[in-house]
């Protein structure tokens, strides 16, 4: 039934597991994907959307490296919006509303095209370990499957408990069993675990809603694909809608707080700070008269709509009564109730920066098992874990993205060195080099790395080369040619004209000289926007590049593996404990560890220089 030994076994078929399995198999590893239900591969367990603030950037990065989340998103997209357009370009973040069923179907089809990727529907309950090295897995039916490496991407399934009011039952997702025993086995080996909580909103029958009482939220045109390989042709986008809760909603929920597992003590673990339940919002912000609710279609051929902003674990009848008080929902029919789920995770400080565990060789963790929340964060970790599992078993150097290279680098660096005690989600504010890490330049930052790894297709290389050629040609044209600006009554170089804050690229392309050049050379709008951005933000970009060089200097000060921090008497006790625990490879890594102060770093540098 199974080959003698797989190169990589991926446990879990969500966003993280799917990316991990494809990355490993695309790099040549004979891979087995084990999941509890093959029909639920690539499920959107919560809202049917991809991208958003900082998350859209990560999808672009996954795509630039040769991952698939961007391609799948484009194939299932039913609405596109570019968020934060009123702010600077570092903040622009693409977001797509997706067809939930098509998204999952496309993942399954994509995975099944790989000849060296096999599938098995079962539950992994134990690992086979020899001399602190993983050599396989054991399933719930007692089947042993050997492998050179294992990637755990268990999502919310480890000892998952679902809460709806007073009712609670074991489950990793509604109507799906949780995974029991694996956490306990890992703890027995020496890992430590924690508990986290997340939740989802009710789904309603769209035919029962009065959309005339809501605010239409249309998609943006033109639609911009997430993948650099996609050519989108979506003629009609689905509408989303906005409505609001009110004091009647809040009063009804407040009276039933004692029936919420969040308030009555049944759920004791921490949920996502930036995605609280509706009852938490009403409680925390008692002075607010309303809260925004987004009504999002679940797909093209379904009546279901997702009620974004109304995540809840209240009893079903309370959820329903509260929903009826919202404008447009007066005659709503509930298709599925919202629920909360608590689950086990393993603090990510137990990992190396290639996502391999420090304790067990060739064992990798990715996704919510590491304390993150969100499809995009999970997919990014899966891609990196899949790459590094392949590299490790082939005795190659690990693939590690730096903080100045990608949001994915920021994500993993934060997890490894700072850890998390609440579900971690990515924001642009977490990246200190966010002007460099824009959504428009992910291919320029990362595709060459994907080429070196062997993940990037010829089509992708060809597209990037063509883009760079056109960009260089256009920039040179702007640099050497002058334009007669009738408004300013000046004849100046196009670059200088564009550097003025009151002049946009759209003003420039109206000039006949430039219009003819663009038409003749078939210059894409995105290239023009990138050149404009570089010219207008040149000072900021150069400053960030200088900051990167300063940080790089800290990274070059290496710390020996056997370095004894007890020798350094002047650093704080907390810093010494953290450094002994994390064992950073460089001063740069040490500086990012929570509890290690700039003063500790200065003392450490002086000590290393003297040595």
From Swiss-Prot:
Species for this entry: Karelsulcia muelleri (strain GWSS) (Sulcia muelleri)
One GO cellular component term noted in the UniProt record for this chain: cytosol
Chain positions recorded as FAD binding sites: 12-17
Family under the similarity heading: Belongs to the MnmG family.
Positions contributing to NAD(+) binding: 271-285
One annotated GO biological process: tRNA methylation
Main location (coarse class): cytoplasm
Cofactor: FAD
Lineage: superkingdom: Bacteria
Subunit structure: Homodimer. Heterotetramer of two MnmE and two MnmG subunits.
Keyword field contains tRNA processing: yes
PROSITE patterns membership: GIDA_1, GIDA_2
Protein name as catalogued: tRNA uridine 5-carboxymethylaminomethyl modification enzyme MnmG
């Amino acid at each position: 039934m199974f080959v003698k030994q797989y190169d990589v076994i991926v446990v879990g078929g969500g966003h993280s597991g799917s990316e991990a399995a494809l990355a490993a198999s695309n790099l040549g590893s004979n891979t087995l994907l084990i999941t509890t239900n093959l029909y639920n591969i690539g499920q959107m367990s919560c809202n049917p959307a991809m991208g958003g603030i900082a998350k859209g950037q990560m999808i672009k990065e996954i795509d630039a490296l040769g991952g698939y989340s961007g391609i799948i998103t484009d194939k299932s997209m039913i609405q596109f919006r570019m968020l934060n357009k009123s702010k600077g370009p570092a903040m622009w973040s693409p977001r797509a509303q997706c067809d939930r069923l098509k998204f999952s179907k496309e993942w399954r089809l994509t995975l099944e095209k790989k000849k060296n990727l096999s599938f098995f529907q079962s539950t992994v309950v134990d690992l086979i370990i020899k001399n602190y090295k993983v050599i396989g897995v054991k399933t719930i039916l007692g089947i042993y499957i050997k492998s050179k490496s294992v990637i755990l991407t268990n999502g919310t399934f480890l000892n998952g408990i679902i809460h709806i009011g007073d009712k609670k039952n074991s489950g990793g997702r509604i109507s799906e069993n949780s995974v029991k025993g694996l956490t306990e086995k890992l703890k027995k080996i020496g890992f430590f675990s924690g508990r986290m909580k997340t939740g989802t909103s009710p789904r309603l029958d769209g035919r029962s809603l009065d959309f005339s009482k809501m605010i239409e939220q249309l998609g943006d045109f033109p639609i911009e694909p997430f993948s650099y390989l996609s050519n989108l042709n979506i003629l009609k986008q689905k509408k989303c809608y906005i409505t609001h809760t009110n004091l009647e909603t809040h009063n009804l929920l407040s009276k039933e707080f004692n029936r919420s597992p969040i308030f009555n003590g049944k759920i004791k673990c921490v949920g996502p700070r930036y995605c609280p339940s509706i009852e938490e919002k009403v409680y925390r912000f008692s002075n607010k008269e309303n809260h925004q609710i987004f009504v999002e279609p679940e797909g093209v051929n379904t009546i279901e709509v997702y009620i974004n902003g109304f995540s809840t674990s209240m009893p079903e009848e309370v959820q329903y009564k509260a929903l009826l008080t919202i404008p447009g929902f007066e005659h709503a029919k509930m298709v599925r109730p919202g629920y909360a789920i608590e689950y086990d995770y393993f603090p990510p400080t137990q990992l190396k920066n290639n996502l391999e565990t420090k304790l067990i060789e060739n064992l990798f963790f990715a996704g919510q098992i590491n304390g993150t929340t969100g499809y995009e964060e999970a997919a990014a970790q899966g891609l990196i874990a899949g790459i590094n599992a392949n590299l490790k078993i082939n005795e190659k150097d690990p693939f590690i993205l730096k903080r100045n290279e990608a949001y994915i680098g920021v994500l993993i660096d934060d997890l490894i060195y700072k850890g998390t005690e609440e579900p971690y989600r990515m924001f642009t504010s977490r990246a200190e080099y966010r002007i460099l890490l824009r959504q428009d330049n992910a291919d320029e930052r990362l595709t060459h790395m994907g080429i070196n790894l062997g993940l990037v297709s010829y089509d992708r290389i060809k597209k990037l080369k063509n883009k760079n050629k056109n960009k260089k040609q256009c920039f040179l044209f702007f640099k050497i040619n002058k334009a007669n600006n009738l408004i300013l009554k000046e004849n100046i170089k196009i670059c200088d004209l564009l550097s003025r804050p009151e002049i946009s690229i759209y003003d420039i392309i109206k000039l006949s000289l430039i219009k003819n050049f663009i038409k003749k050379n078939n210059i894409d709008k995105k290239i023009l926007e990138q050149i404009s951005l570089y010219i207008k933000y040149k000072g900021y970009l150069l400053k960030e590049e200088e900051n990167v060089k300063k940080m790089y200097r800290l990274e070059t000060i290496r710390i020996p593996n056997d370095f004894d921090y007890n020798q350094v008497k002047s650093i704080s006790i907390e810093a010494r404990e953290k450094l002994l625990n994390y064992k950073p490879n460089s001063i740069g890594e040490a500086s990012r560890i929570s509890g290690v102060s700039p003063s500790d770093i200065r003392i450490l540098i002086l000590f290393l220089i003297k040595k």
